[in-house]
Amino acid sequence: MRLPFKFSAALGLGLPLVLCSFGIGSRVARADTWNLPSPINDSNTSVSFVVDSTFSTINGTTKDLFGSISLKDRKDPLSIVVDLAIKVKTIDTDWDDRDETLQECMASDQFPTVSFISQRLSDNCKPTLIDISKRCSGTLTGILTIRDVTKEVTLPVEISKEADSYRIKGTLPLQWADYNIEDPSILIVQLDRTANISYETVVPLKH
């Protein structure tokens, strides 16, 4: 069974993962732009994962997230660049032996981070539209790198406007084998082959 990484980047994946939750605000008093750039860290972003196993559901978290959210083109509100990195050795499933096994399968010494760099937000999530509907469900296209594998992924995104921020979250299912990750199952405890990465992040409307 595979780990649902929960990019409660509360982005990216970077992804990835998340990949595996983020908010965006408006820098000026216009509804056609975001309040960017904005940093990504543990105070505004979280990445977590859920893994189904033979006997139970395994929940995991990450920490020491770092990165940023910016616009490639200030005139294009869809040109969002989420640059998120997750340290593999911060993965915590509340069981040291299991954490070590997972980190070994991900070759954490050789590939210490999981990264996600976004390229484009879907058209239906323009800030002008969100200001009217207060929310949107769209996608964020980007590049996810895990171990020695880099793939373009389409990250599901839900953006909601709150009193003083935009909250962004979503979940991305991944196959272990697609990223050259050996089956991290321990002894008779089997993990699902699909990992669901969830993220959430929040960025204030104003600095």
Task: Give residue spans per PLM region.
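Short stretches within intrinsically disordered, low-complexity N-terminal or propeptide regions
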Residues: L11-G12, A31
